[in-house]
Amino acid sequence: MSTSHVATKDQSVVRSLLRLWPYVRPVRVRLFSAAVVAIVASCMSLVIPLVLKWMVDGPVSDRDTGGIWLGAFVLLILGIAEAILFGFRRWLVARPLAGVEARMRAALFAHLQRLPMAFHDRWASGQLLSRGTTDLMLVRMFLAFPLTFLLVNGTTILVGFIILLWQEWTLGLVLLAPIVPLFILCSYFESRYSVAARQAQDQVGDLTTVVEESVLGIRIVKGFGRNRSQARAFHELARKLRGTELVKARLLAGIWAAVTVLPEIAVGGALVLGTVQVADGALSAGTLVAFLSTALALRWPVESIGFLLAMSQEAATATNRYFEVMDVEPESATPGGPTEQDDTSAAATAKPSLDKAATKGEMRFEGVEFRYPDAAPDSVPVLARIDLAVRPGETMALVGGTGSGKTTLTALVPRLHEVTAGRITLDGEDIARLPRERLRSLVSVAFEEPTLFSATVAENVLMGSDAAAPGDLERALDVAQASFVHALPQGGDTEVGEQGLSLSGGQRQRLALARAVVGRPRFLVLDDPLSALDVHTEALVEAALRQVLKETTALVVAHRPSTVLLADRVALLSQGRIAAVGTHQELLRTNAEYAWLMSGAETTTDPERASGAGSTVPAPAVESPLEGNVR
């Protein structure tokens, strides 16, 4: 089941945002320069009231026209300089922060490739997509604006109040009165807004999941007429997201009103008190004008506190969500050993083992046991006491009923999952000790459900081998009987579209098979590779596949008797255990469950008839249609 929301330890906003430092560090000089430029620009706005004071107490009082024009010119220069500096600040941060976002997204993508299959089994794709898109956009916006202006506005407010207290300390104290209630309100706002922000960003992930599933499954949606049910699911999630966004809007409106009204009341009180002082002659008109102008210059820095805190909280939440994925341990190269991040370097420095050209091709399962990572320790394992030897150059078929563990067993060979106990060896080498990159260059896999990417036919097939020669592509297509490729508009250069849905199921499966054999692997694992083929195409593929299987050691999951005939021997898997091993003909004669499976009775007969798995009692009542044809 996919995970949508992950419980994490509460962290302060500052502590969460500090985790961005490794990504920000390369551009720290540009960000620091931008902050300095913004501080200088903001401080220029505080110089304007001082110029006004000089003009009112000097040229205006003395009716000095020249002085007035000079003051106006200075004000114009200050305004233009402030605008230029703020524009320069934006230029300084635009490119570096786009790079930070790109690096974080690339790091997330690379990390996802290294995470174990158990992680991908649990997590909804929409949650991962939202972390790589919406969340990183929020982080970039924070670095571009709130990060700088929390510093700039804080500095501006500090310098501004120093000037106010220097101009007239009694009026300055009046303006300082709202600080305590504002601090309390901001703390309350931050605690409430953080909850709403996290909920909204999780809901965006849920909504993304529904949209993605509906688009990828559009054939099912339309085929079963589920448009309305999918629309209801979408609208329900959209309604919840809308409600959460309204909660955020109400909180933001409340804090905005508070940080606007309380300072305005203080400014009004200072204006009344200042007017009285001017009337009493205790204060000059120019000083009052300068004081009020300075107070008004601080209006925007104070009023912006609300939405800057909101954006910071959203960025902190986005950062936490990002690191929820990045903190997951990647697959280790060996149990308890280095992570897969170190696989490449380890493989490069270690002495090569299992050279592809020199391998004999023996595959062994020794006491293998497996249970999924999220299963209870005392739960029944999916696979138990698996002992199986596949000789070099041999093809071993895996046969078993639904849920017997066939697909799980094949997934252990390329280490898509790690064995819980026991070991799997290739030519005596424990695969747990092989770097994954090395292991997967030796083992090629074709899954029952073929997955194609939004790329060309050739690119999809050549994913099976980095070193494939041009002739290997044609050979692989011939083996998979994928001659339809040559009839496509651009042949092998034809784009197959997302998930390869422009092709039929059989065509996708043939391309997946071609991908598995293109690299001439030493070990081949096929999970029912012919299930989507018609009888005629299946016969052609089997004929070509026989030649490939002569050159490799293969483990083939088989459901059809015709696929079983490709194998030298058959292993019967029942309830997660190896019930019997032998040739097809031997098992037909000696094992009732195998004979029942091969007869096709699985769909019409009570499976309890075959409960005696591994029994050597003959089953004369069940005769395979192939028995008489086997030599």
Question: How should these model regions be labeled?
Answer:
Residues 21, 25, 117-121, 134-143, ...:
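An intracellular "coupling" helix at the cytosolic face of ABC transporter transmembrane type-1 domains
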Residues 341-631:
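ABC-type nucleotide-binding domain
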Residues 1-45, 60, 64-74, 89-93, ...:
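Membrane-integrated ABC transporters
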Residues 18, 29-50, 54, 71, ...:
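Alpha-helical segments in transporter systems
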Residues 63-66, 163-177, 251-320, 325-326:
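Helix-loop-helix
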Residues 13, 31-85, 165-170, 268, ...:
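Transmembrane helix-loop-helix hairpins at lipid-water interfaces of multipass membrane proteins
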Residues 3-13, 36-37, 41-53, 57, ...:
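Juxtamembrane helix-loop junctions of ABC transporter transmembrane domains
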Residues 26, 30-43, 81, 145-199, ...:
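Transmembrane helices of ABC transporter permease
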